[in-house]
Amino acid sequence: MVKQKQVCIIGAGVSGLAAAKAFLARGHHVTVVERSGDLGGVWEPARSYPDVQTQSPKDLYRYTDRGMPRSYPEWPTGPQVHAYLADYARDYGIKRLIRFNTAVLQMNRRPDSIPGWKLDLRGTDSHITQENFDFVVVCTGQFNEPQVISHPGKDTFETQGGRILHSSQYNDAAIAKGRKVVVLGGSKSATDIAVNAVNAGASDVTLVYRRPVWRCPYFIGGLINFKRIFYTRALEAMFRSGSVASLLRFTQAVAKPLVWVSWRGLESLLKLQLKLTKCDMVPDERVEDGVNCSVPIATPGFFPMVADGRIKAIRGSFDHYDGKTIVMTGSERIIADLVVLATGYRIGVPFLPQTFRDNLVDPDGQYRLYRLIANPDLPDLGFVGFNSSFCTVLCADMAANWLVRYADGQLAYQPTKDEMHKIIDMMLHF
């Protein structure tokens, strides 16, 4: 008989909802704390930029027990994803368990050697309370704290009328109209915002990026849905595996020339379709080295806009602001009214004391997590959504269901602490 636990889920995004449902379904008492005023995480309307849509098709960006509505397009928009998540939370009784506008300030082990954690929570009235839980699931994921980079001269730039936003704050296209917009970053959000700014009537749009990366169009060759190529066992077999099985090594060695030709063919097709040579945005690395657990989607319209000059793409980075001018590291100067920092997010668990973080994170920033879910040195604690994958929602769903069984000691094979450390070391080395 499994003891019912008091479980705290930190975060009400994609991963938090999956974790809440998994623990709720197995009879545990669940509390979800969410620091913002709405659920959805990156899909929360206040954090979503205009025209955002999924990179994965709707039949893969979904929970295992609830598909997206048939009326949704192949790649749903931000508002559609948020509606899907809201309906999911309502229908499975999760929304009533969420405490919105509640932040976790700190968590520590419970006193007197009692299993579990004590959390310091700050609610809507700014009052701080302490609550004990038997198990905690961290679902703050990879997109938690905006990574805001500050450059010298920032204050003067803003004093003279310039505006600087993080990409998560670019939620109204009207702010780009008539402005000279500079986007810093090379991610999907950066190219999305650059295209949106052009369509919104910006007088000038510049994208500043460090290096070009391989991107995949929604339809390869204009005909084939990219999932028919990238979401297949055939493509998976083209990557080097962590397995040491003799037969697998032999098979990969025999197929190596064919695999090499296949990758070069894909590179040629992408260069041609996306006009990478004309845009001077051909990546230096091979496509198979750039495509790992994820590959950014080519924003529709981005490369044509670079090719015809509507978007100016400059390789480099900011050095400092000089009045209303951005001075690049190579001394090039760009006049700007609006700067959008598409510089990503910081991955972290700031509410976890440093002593515990030292067990969780290697000096090089890698998380020591078995199956990217649990750390053997941090009992009564799990993580959902800390992996990078083509299928974010499906992975969160599977991780949550594995974690609840791990917490209950009901896995078909419950790994020992030493076994978990061994697998973690192997995966980090790989």
Q: Can you annotate each of these PLM segments?
A:
Residues 2-51, 55, 67-221, 256-420:
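Flavin (primarily FAD) cofactor-binding/catalytic cores of flavoenzymes
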